[in-house]
C-alpha cells in the first residue's frame, strides 16, 4: 500500500462482472489495445491504479479491478470466504467473462501473490505478468516451512484488534507504516486514507488467510514472461522475494524504482509506467 493519487479521473460508477458465485467484481477501464489488467493489494481497490490508467491507456486497454470483499462491493461477499486462492481463480474468471484476454497482468503486494498464482493455474489467460513487491513469505531450501516472522504477526494482530475495536485510524497507521516506512500513514494523501478506511474491514480476514510461501518448484511452472519491480526503499522482505523470484523464474527481468518505497507505482508513476510499457513492448517484439 501507499498513498493514492486522486481517483477523480476514474468513472464515478464502475462497471462490474458477475462471477459464478454470484459475487460481482467491479472495475474501471480506460484506453484501447491489448488488455492490461491491474490487481490491487491490501486495503486497496481499483482506485489504487489511477496513475497507471492515466499513463498507460494511450497504448493499452487498461482495466483495474476490485477483488471480491473490497470496496465498492463490500457487503455482497460477507458470507463468502476471504481467500487469496479464490481471488486468484476469480481473476481468471473475470478475464474469461470480460472477453478480451489473454491479458497482461500487473499485481502489487498481496495482489502480486494473487496474480502469481493466477498465472500458474491459468496460463491460458495470461500474456505477461508484472509483480510489484509481491507479498508472501519466501521458502528457503533446507529450512522449516516459511511463515511471516512472529514480530510481524504480532503487529498485524494488534492492527486488526485496533480496527475491530473501532480505532480504525490507529490500526491502519500501524499496518501501513509496517509495510512502507514509519510515519508514512501520517503523510498519506486524503485519497489514500479514504481508500484504506473503506477497506479496513478486510484486514482481519486477510490475516486469517496467510499467503503461501514462494518455492522454486512453483516458480518453474510459470512460463510467461515476468517483470519484477521493487521499490528502492521497500522493506527488506520484498527485496528478498524479488531476488529469489528473479533467480527461480525461467523468463524474468527486474527493475527497481529509485527513491520509492512499497507504493512505487504511486510515488513515481512515470518510472513505474515506463518500466511496464518498455517490458510489454519488448515482449511483443519477440
Regions picked out by a protein language model, each given a short descriptive name:
Residues 100-144:
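Conserved hydrolase catalytic core segment
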Residues 19-80, 94:
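Conserved HGGG/HGGXW glycine-rich cap/lid loop of the alpha/beta-hydrolase fold
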Residues 164-204:
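Conserved alpha/beta-hydrolase catalytic His-Asp/Glu region
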Residues 1-37, 58-61, 277, 281-286:
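Alpha/beta-hydrolase fold catalytic core
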